[in-house]
Design a protein with these regions (language model features):
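Gly/Pro-rich hinge or "lid" segments in bacterial periplasmic/extracellular proteins
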Residues: 90-94, 174, 179-233, 237, ...
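Structural transition elements
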Residues: 329-363, 380-383
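N-terminal lobe/hinge region of extracytoplasmic solute-binding protein
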Residues: 57-107, 137, 203-205
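Surface-exposed binding/hinge segments that line
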Residues: 104, 114, 148-191, 212
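Extracytoplasmic/peripheral linker and loop segments enriched in polar/acidic and small residues
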Residues: 400-411, 416, 438-504, 525
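Ligand-site clamp/hinge motif
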Residues: 226-271, 283, 391-392, 400-402
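Long beta-strand-rich cores associated with HINT superfamily self-processing modules
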Residues: 502-525
């Protein structure tokens, strides 16, 4: 399938809507959300039916079910079906109601949300404004050290104005507020958190309630009969598993062990697209960036010249061709076309440039070369393969790379502990580019796995975050992209066109720009 065929369905569908919504929300215009739910994806066929079990195979195992502390996409994929957010992004790129049924600006530094009055937590507690205030004030309290706090630094506090109304007070205008609400925070219940460890026993108001978690095997969710949206959800249960690799997932789909899988071997996509009786794929929708993290907190990559040497050595096109089989787009930025944030900026345009890389190594006193480690999750075989290709590329400038695939938990432990030189990763939070750069590069962020600390970086990121005008943010963004490319602790090499694979009878599952796996509207024909 050509690049044009893969992207033309995405390119024109959300740009005007996205810009309109950001203009209305971030600029402070009042907005009332109409209706209670988003429309079903257009590609779903027939009338929804109740019943059945969705057997899901994701890429990686979850490790933490507490929305305040969870940092891995694999955890979010599960618990986002257990909890609800105040607002969501639908498959058309619009912000739509969640637990908030409407909202309006109160001056330029406050928002008031009217909440639904019929939601119930899975422990039987009625949902009220107090739960929203508790969720966010828990998040904002620095003593709790919640990593998600970085997404909401301009929020001074959240107060209940009544049983079903809350006010968000801001220290200053906050451009990406609604993108953050739609992506980063689920509403929790104080009593539930006190009674059981939320990292292991999630309790939300979502469409499915948590049943069991058999470590290293599966997680089971079942329909919540008191869900606040009438008739939803449709499925009886969802069983999440995380097989070791793409081939195992595909075999499981073909044999019926699974009826929904997150990925397939990329080289087999053209063949699988013809097997319409056995399976189907969702429309390819949003991208999410794949990148290298260079550990700037210790030698050798505390030296910018050596970070730049890596950036000038890698061949993005070769990586995409040999590893991702053109299911990725070659890019140096986290939000390429068709994102309205696309800039086309590439500080290393014309690369790879091996002579320039060798000169940078020599300037840094490493003309004789380096020996480095590459940290990667073993459950993500494409990133393992990326490391193998990278190893061959770096040999050309005298760098030896030891590829170290680790199980998810150990990988995360070493990533957080910064016990690596280079690590492969991908990011699932790009509704607004602030959600990529601020957590990954700001010195205050627990997500700054690169250990990159810079007053200039913080200054630039703060300016981008605390500007409400969409036009002003768009104007400053290209230079922000270029500056971080030149600093080089994060090296974006591609963006994936996300699509899901499933049995033909699975309906109502499509990628969202938030990249959450939300099965509220999914049903079995």
């Amino acid at each position: 399938m050509s690049e044009q065929e893969r992207t033309e369905g995405v390119a024109g569908s959300t740009r005007r809507q996205w810009l309109a919504q950001m203009g209305g929300l971030a600029a402070g215009a009042g907005l009332s959300a109409l209706g209670g739910t988003a429309a079903r994806p257009a590609w779903a066929q027939g009338q929804p039916k109740r019943g059945g079990v969705l057997k899901v195979a994701t890429v990686d195992k979850p490790v933490n079910m507490d929305p305040g502390y969870a940092q891995l996409y694999s955890s979010l994929q599960v618990y986002q079906n257990v909890y609800n957010k105040l607002v969501y992004v639908d498959d058309k790129g619009q912000f739509v109601p969640g637990l908030a049924r409407s909202w309006k600006a109160d001056g330029d530094k406050a928002w008031v949300f009217d909440l639904v009055d019929n939601a119930v937590f899975h422990n039987g507690e009625a949902f009220t404004a107090k739960d929203v205030a508790f969720t966010f004030n828990r998040l904002l309290d620095a003593k709790n050290k919640l990593p998600m706090r970085v997404f909401f630094s301009p929020v001074e506090g959240v107060e209940a104005l009544g049983a079903h109304q809350v006010r968000f007070s801001l220290s200053r205008p906050f451009g990406p507020l609604f993108a953050m609400l739609a992506q980063a925070t689920e509403i929790v219940n104080e009593k539930a958190l006190a009674e059981k460890d939320p990292k292991l026993f999630p309790v939300g108001t979502g469409p499915y309630r948590f049943v069991e978690w058999v470590k290293d095997d599966h997680i089971t969710l079942e329909r919540w009969d008191k869900y606040f949206r009438p008739g939803k959800p449709y499925l009886d249960r969802i069983i999440f598993q995380a097989p070791a690799d793409d081939t195992v997932r595909l075999t499981g789909l073909q044999t019926g062990r699974y009826n929904w899988i997150q990925t397939v071997p990329p080289q087999r996509i053209p063949e699988l697209e013809r097997q319409t009786r056995e399976m189907k794929s969702s429309p390819g929708r949003p991208y999410f960036p794949f990148y290298l993290m260079l550990n700037a907190s210790r030698p050798p990559f505390n030296d910018k010249r050596l970070r730049q040497a890596i950036a000038w050595t890698i061949d993005r096109s070769e990586i995409v061709k040999l590893v991702y089989y053109d299911t990725h787009v070659v890019t140096a930025e986290p939000t390429p076309e068709p994102s309205p944030w696309a800039t086309g900026v590439n500080a290393h345009k014309g690369g790879p440039n091996l002579e320039k890389a060798k000169q940078l190594l020599a300037d840094a006193g490493k003309a004789s070369g380096l020996t480095l480690t590459y940290l990667v999750k073993s459950q993500v075989p494409v990133l393992v393969k990326t490391g193998e290709i990278l190893r061959e590329q770096l040999k050309k400038v005298g760098i030896t790379l030891d590829v170290r695939p680790l199980e998810s938990g150990q990988y995360f432990e070493e990533l957080v502990g910064k016990k690596f030189d280079i690590a492969g990763g991908y990011w699932s939070v790009t509704v607004d580019p602030d959600m990529f750069y601020y957590p990954m590069q700001h010195s205050s962020s627990a997500w700054n796995f690169c250990g990159f600390k810079s007053e200039e970086a913080d200054k630039r990121l703060d300016a981008f975050r605390f500007t409400a005008s969409p036009a002003a943010r768009k104007k400053m963004y290209p230079e922000l992209v270029r500056w971080f490319q030149e600093e080089g602790s994060l090296v974006v090499f591609s963006n994936e066109l996300q699509r899901y694979w499933m049995k033909p009878n699975v309906q109502g599952s499509t990628p969202l720009s938030s990249l959450e796996l939300r099965f509220e509207d999914t049903w079995l024909a």
